[in-house]
Curated annotation (Swiss-Prot):
The protein, known as: Large ribosomal subunit protein bL17
Species assigned in the record: Salinispora tropica (strain ATCC BAA-916 / DSM 44818 / JCM 13857 / NBRC 105044 / CNB-440)
Entry keyword annotation includes Cytoplasm: no
Keyword Phosphoprotein: no
One Pfam family recorded for the sequence: Ribosomal_L17
Compositional bias segments (type: Acidic residues): 179-190
Disulfide bonds: none
Region of interest called Disordered, as start-end residue ranges on this chain: 128-190
Classification via Gene3D superfamilies: Ribosomal protein L17
Bias (Low complexity): 143-154
Keywords tagged on the record: Ribonucleoprotein, Ribosomal protein
Record's subunit section: Part of the 50S ribosomal subunit. Contacts protein L32.
GO cellular component, one term: cytosolic large ribosomal subunit
Length: 190
């Protein structure tokens, strides 16, 4: 049986403290950082680090242990699938506490507790086939770009007008519209 913490409990009873820390941990994993009192942040830090360490194991027993503390399945999914893989090479120290000064209403010392590495939006991994296709398309676009540029007009050509097609478009307008159509097709393929 774990030894109870010394001193007063946060919020009164041990059960209330346990639930409050679980809710703080859930908010921390949802948002990446939260602002709370220094005391609550210091009490939350070991719990959050234990949960991240369990999430790094990734097995079913660890998931059930974490679900015993954090009741929200979406947060547990985020913890196991997004947060834990970021800390695969780190053996602890997943959180940071930054003191922010006293609260305006009651002058309680406040702090921000945050995950050390910022939450990043997961980039989709491109497979080899699509990466090769995109590189080939990029090469084609680069090869076509210099060919479409028209040479600078010489002094004798300043008075001459651009050739006009049957539809009334100039050559430059046709080239611009062709380029726009190609770019649109590439965006639709991607």
């Amino acid at each position: 049986m774990p030894t109870p913490t010394k001193g007063a409990r946060l919020g009164g009873s041990p059960a209330h403290e346990r639930l409050m820390l679980a809710n703080l941990a859930m908010s921390l994993f949802q948002h990446g950082k939260i602002q709370t009192t220094e005391t609550k942040a210091r009490r939350l830090r070991p719990l959050a680090e234990q949960l991240i360490t369990k999430a790094k194991r990734g097995d079913l027993a660890s998931r059930r242990r974490v679900l015993g503390v954090v009741k929200d399945k979406d947060v547990v999914y985020t913890l196991f699938e997004q947060i834990a893989p970021r800390y695969a090479n780190r053996n602890g120290g997943y959180t940071r506490i930054v003191k922010t000064g006293p609260r305006k209403g009651d002058a309680a010392p406040m702090a921000i507790i945050e995950l050390v590495e910022e939450l990043a939006v997961a980039q989709p991994k491109a497979n080899k086939k699509t990466a090769g296709r995109k590189a080939a398309q990029q090469d084609k676009v680069e090869a076509l770009a210099p060919a479409e540029e028209t040479p600078a007009p010489t002094s004798g050509d300043q008075d001459a007008e651009a050739p006009v097609s049957v539809s009334g478009d100039t050559a430059a307008a046709r080239a611009d519209s062709d380029l726009a159509v190609e770019e649109n097709n590439e965006q639709n393929k991607a």
